[in-house]
C-alpha cells in the first residue's frame, strides 16, 4: 500500500495533525517523565503548533500528515530557526505502520523542502531513548552536535529543566 504526504491546510488535515501531535507528545511526555523527570505542557505545545501560522506553515515552514491505507498515521514539520537554519519537529509515525517507509519519505520531503527554501543546514532534537529514529536521521546524513540555543524546548522549559533536557536529548544537524 502506498504512503502519501498531505500538506496540513484544511479542517480534516488540521484535525489529523492535532490528533497525531497529541499522540506523539503524550508518548514523549511519558518517556520524559519516567526517564528524566521532565514534564511538558502538551496543550500549550499543540496550541502553538496549530495556531501559530508562522511556525510550521508556509512560507516559513512546512507541515505534513502521512496517509497510509486511507488513514492519517504520521506527522512531521519543518520550522525556520534562523534565515540559514531550519529544524525538523514533531516527526512521528504510529508504531503499527513503522517500517513501511513513511518516516523516510517524510524526512526526505522535509529535506527537499529545506533545500528548496534555501536553508544551509537543518537541525533536530530527539530524546536519547528514541534510537530507531536516530538511525533514520543518520542514514540521510545527520550528525550529532552540541545542544543549540534555538531549540524549541526553550519555549516550554525553565532554565534548570533545560539542562536536564539537554542531557536527555540528542541534537543533530545536516548541512544542506
Predicted regions and their residues:
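Active-site acidic-Proline motif in GNAT/NAT acetyltransferases
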Residues: 94-100, 128-129
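C-terminal "cap" of GNAT-fold acetyltransferases
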Residues: 120-122, 127-176
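Acetyl-CoA-dependent GNAT
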Residues: 7-89, 94-95, 107-109, 113, ...
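Residues forming the Rossmann-fold NAD(P)(H) cofactor-binding site
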Residues: 100, 104, 108
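Short polybasic/polar patches that bind polyanions
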Residues: 98, 115, 138
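Loop/helix-junction capping segments adjacent to catalytic residues or to phosphate/diphosphate-binding pockets
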Residues: 11-15, 100, 131
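Extreme N-terminal starter segment of soluble prokaryotic enzymes
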Residues: 2-4
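Conserved G/P- and acidic residue-centered "switch" motifs that form tight phosphate/ATP-binding loops
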Residues: 70, 101, 118
Amino acid at each position: 500500500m502506498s504512503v502519501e504526504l498531505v500538506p496540513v491546510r484544511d479542517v480534516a488535515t488540521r484535525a489529523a495533525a492535532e490528533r497525531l501531535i497529541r499522540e506523539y507528545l503524550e508518548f514523549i511526555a511519558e518517556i520524559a517523565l519516567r526517564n528524566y523527570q521532565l514534564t511538558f505542557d502538551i496543550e500549550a505545545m499543540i496550541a502553538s503548533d496549530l495556531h501559530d501560522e508562522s511556525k510550521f506553515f508556509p512560507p516559513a515552514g512546512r507541515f505534513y500528515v502521512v496517509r497510509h491505507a486511507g488513514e492519517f498515521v504520521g506527522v512531521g514539520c519543518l520550522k525556520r530557526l534562523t534565515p540559514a537554519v531550519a529544524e525538523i519537529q514533531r516527526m512521528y509515525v504510529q508504531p503499527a505502520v513503522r517500517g513501511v517507509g513513511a518516516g523516510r519519505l517524510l524526512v526526505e520531503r522535509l529535506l527537499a523542502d529545506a533545500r528548496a527554501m534555501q536553508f544551509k543546514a537543518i537541525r533536530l532534537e530527539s530524546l536519547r531513548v528514541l534510537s530507531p529514529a536516530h538511525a533514520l536521521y543518520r542514514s540521510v546524513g545527520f550528525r550529532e552536535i552540541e545542544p543549540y540555543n534555538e531549540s524549541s524546548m526553550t519555549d516550554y522549559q525553565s532554565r534548570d529543566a533545560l539542562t536536564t533536557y539537554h542531557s536527555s536529548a540528542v541534537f543533530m544537524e545536516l548541512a544542506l
